[in-house]
């Protein structure tokens, strides 16, 4: 079996989901954000390029506006996300600054990466920010994204967005933090004997079939979108680690080669 070795990894995209940022009671998980900021700042100080793709605008918005559930009306959803995005970035900026790290905000819609000119502009922005030692924090621009057939500008969810960001920035590794330990051979919430897959070298039909089901009440991404993200990463000859986000310091252990989560990597020659 292939051995994990991330010594040559220079550019890392980390994706954190709403379930890792917002607690079950709807309150923001400050401890986790602090850990994440510490880890990313430590890696930046070692010369790595870091990009964070962060969900959570809706969760932050619901908390600030004291709403206990996501509105069903699209315009209201966009309003709540818009409020939450400001709060989320404010908190990120504050906490990252404790570790002498500056952050920036990049809000994307799908059409930005489809058109060559806007894609070149956003790619240049990423490169400039990282050259200045700044950590770009990326989210979908929920207030203007639409999902209509004639003008679809949504990525679908931030799992797929993180794979797109990894592609356009030519990242060496995508680390996806989730509320699960990785990819299992069957659903661990149903089957007690479900086994965690340490490595996946090929996305088979069987894996896709076993990855049904949706996400948490605050987020949108389920296991299927993570598998689709891995497919996108493979299409660009990249690699991805899917791991539990409950302890962001585990990112450092993963990069040391510890077998945490599921490592998606193609065998040489594929």
Swiss-Prot record:
Pfam families: AA_kinase (PF00696). Its main location: cytoplasm. It is an enzyme of class 2 (transferase). It catalyses: L-glutamate + ATP = L-glutamyl 5-phosphate + ADP. Disulfide bonds: none annotated. Pathway: Amino-acid biosynthesis; L-proline biosynthesis; L-glutamate 5-semialdehyde from L-glutamate: step 1/2. CDD domains: AAK_G5K_ProB. It is found in: Cytoplasm. Its EC number is 2.7.2.11. GO terms for molecular function: ATP binding; glutamate 5-kinase activity. Substrate binds at residues 55, 142, 158. Keywords: Amino-acid biosynthesis, ATP-binding, Cytoplasm, Kinase, Nucleotide-binding, Proline biosynthesis, Transferase. One of its GO terms (cellular component) is cytosol. One of its GO terms (biological process) is L-proline biosynthetic process. ATP binds at residues 15, 178-179, 220-226. HAMAP family: ProB. Belongs to the glutamate 5-kinase family. PANTHER family: GLUTAMATE 5-KINASE, ISOPENTENYL PHOSPHATE KINASE. Catalyzes the transfer of a phosphate group to glutamate to form L-glutamate 5-phosphate. This is Glutamate 5-kinase. The lineage of its organism: Bacteria, Bacillati, Bacillota, Bacilli, Lactobacillales. The gene is proB.
